[in-house]
Structures are given as structure tokens and as C-alpha cells.
Regions:
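Terminal, low-structured helical/coil segments at or just beyond the last alpha-helical repeat
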Residues: 18-21, 38, 79, 83-112
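Alpha-helical adaptor scaffolds
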Residues: 1-71
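Short, charged low-complexity intrinsically disordered segments located at boundaries
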Residues: 55-61, 77-79, 112
Length: 112
């Protein structure tokens, strides 16, 4: 397996991929929380990168769903947020399933 050398030592490609996906999602989510609308377009790119690296993370999908909604793409937001709910169900995480479902309902009602 490919190893990447960084300040923390040698990381496997999988570790490096997960680290970068988490960083990208965290940056995007911080913009969602800050409500800095002028940064939504850039945050959307970070969220898309995170989901590109981990297509099944309910957390990453949730962030992406929020940002599609906030950038005016309600249909895409519903599609992605539905995947977040399904992913949370598959992880058998009731609290995450509840929160992602709540967000999905708010998106559908235009109340996010």
C-alpha cells in the first residue's frame, strides 16, 4: 500500500484520504455554522471533495445537503440529504438518523 510521509510520520493512502476528507468537511461545515453566505460557493466545493473521497459518510453527505440547499439547489439537496439519512440508517445510529431526517424535512419545507 502507498505510504505518504507527513509531519505525523508515514500514513497509508487510506489514512491520508480520510484525513483530507475530514479536513474538507470540517471547513465546509464551519461555513454552514457561521452562516457566511459569501463563502457558501467555496464551501460547496470543499463538501463535494469530502463526499468524493468518502461517498457513504452521513456527516459529509449532511454537510453537502445543507450547502446545496443554501446555494439554491433544492432538488440536489433533497437527493443528497436522502442519501445521508440512508447512510445514517445503515450505520445504525438513531440520533444521526433523526438529525439527518429532520434536516431533510426542513429542506423539503424550505425551512432550513
Amino acid at each position: 500500500e502507498l505510504k505518504v510521509n507527513n509531519s505525523d510520520g508515514m500514513l497509508s493512502w487510506s489514512d491520508y484520504k480520510n484525513l483530507n476528507a475530514n479536513l474538507a468537511n470540517n471547513v465546509a461545515w464551519s461555513v454552514v455554522e457561521s452562516k457566511e453566505t459569501n463563502l457558501y460557493a467555496q464551501a460547496l466545493k470543499w463538501a463535494e471533495l469530502a463526499v468524493g473521497l468518502d461517498k457513504n459518510s452521513p456527516y459529509f453527505l449532511d454537510t453537502l445537503g445543507h450547502l446545496y440547499y443554501f446555494t439554491g439547489n433544492k432538488q440536489k439537496a433533497i437527493e443528497v440529504q436522502t442519501k445521508a439519512v440512508e447512510s445514517a440508517k445503515s450505520e445504525q445510529n438513531p440520533s444521526l438518523e433523526f438529525s439527518t431526517t429532520s434536516v431533510l424535512n426542513k429542506i423539503k419545507a424550505n425551512k432550513l
